[in-house]
Amino acid sequence: MKTRHRILTVLLTALLVILLPVSLIFGTSGSEPPFTGAALTYHNQLKEKGFPADYAVALTRLHLLYPAWEFEPLAVARSWKETVTLQTRDAKTNLINSDGRFSKYRHKTNANLYDSGFYQASKEAVSYFLDPRNFLTEADIFQFYDQQTASATSRAALETVLAGTFMERAKLESGQTYADALMQIGKEVGIDPVFLAVRLRQEQGDGKSPLLGGKCGSLLQEYYANQTATTESGKPIKPPAPGTLDGDLTALDGYYNLFNIKASGDGVFAIYKNALEYAQSKGWNTREKALRGGAEFLKNDYVKRGQSTVYLQKFDVCTTDSLHQYMQNVGGALSEGRSLYRSFAENNLTDIGCVFRIPVFSGMPALTSPDPAD
């Protein structure tokens, strides 16, 4: 009966979305909320918490589907205009993949490539990904999932994230699987193992990065000695000029950086070298140490600073004097959030209590920021 009731609720909610005018769906200023009874009461409670009307309408719809979910507003000190200005001031703050599929998100006039294969994102693209109202849907809202209040993660959910990746069956130096290690590290560090796994997928992709192999120092030495211009995939390497580099780069062999911490710079050479030198400074001479060290870095440098969602780690709206952001990919939070959702959905965990911490800006435009690709 519970399943039948849930299906009926979903169907009725979907039908309501189809039949209602767009102005009601998004709660246009001056319109009456499309709810009655308990739903209207909940909608009004959201507004009393501090959510604007357009947020409250979308979140009430989610509440009808997932009553255990909780939504908390995060009042942002900067205005919307100030935030967009800060996020677009430096070309490298928000980047978009050079793949032609994302061409509509590129800056209109800046044709420079950054970090070996990324263009500056346009102001319109930044506004779109920054605007929380664009992502108050069942899957996309998981970029606001609060790690500080995460419920106990099941191993099945973790294994769903690892499935089909280089981590699925691989073992670490101790003989532990990635799933075993992530469950243990997550518990000991105090950070959701599923979140860690999603971040690893985002950062490492197919698992072929030299930062995972333990021989990246030798690769850098080869790039430097041969003055190699590009990688096999065509990414610019930009090695230092001959005679300008002191020391033996092979000393960086045996170090690992699974979360790509400090992996930035102009060209592949700088990206790998910076990441390896950071790993060396932390003593990450096994993949297991790199896993634990990366998790501790995320906990101490982000979650404890209030940046406890992937959105807040991408778009730092917590600090007032500077930007403290984990990633440059303008769509990174959306991508990671969807991965989190899939893990929950495929393991029937969407009905458990989740807390979503959603930024609210002053001076937001009346309409949501449009998707440049539309």
Predicted regions and their residues:
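Cell-wall glycan-active module
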Residues: 1-189, 194, 228-237, 292-296, ...
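Substrate-binding clefts and substrate-entry loops adjacent to catalytic sites
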Residues: 166-172, 231-241, 251-285
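Alpha-helical, low-charge segments enriched in small hydrophobic residues
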Residues: 175, 182-186, 198-207, 221
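Secretory-pathway/luminal and periplasmic proteins that interact with or process carbohydrate-rich
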Residues: 191-194, 204-222, 226-230, 239-246, ...
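Generic alpha-helical structural context detector
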Residues: 197-201, 263, 296
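Solvent-exposed loop/turn segments at secondary-structure junctions
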Residues: 202-207, 263-269, 318-322, 362-367
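Extracellular protease catalytic domains of secreted zymogens
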Residues: 219, 244, 276-280, 291, ...
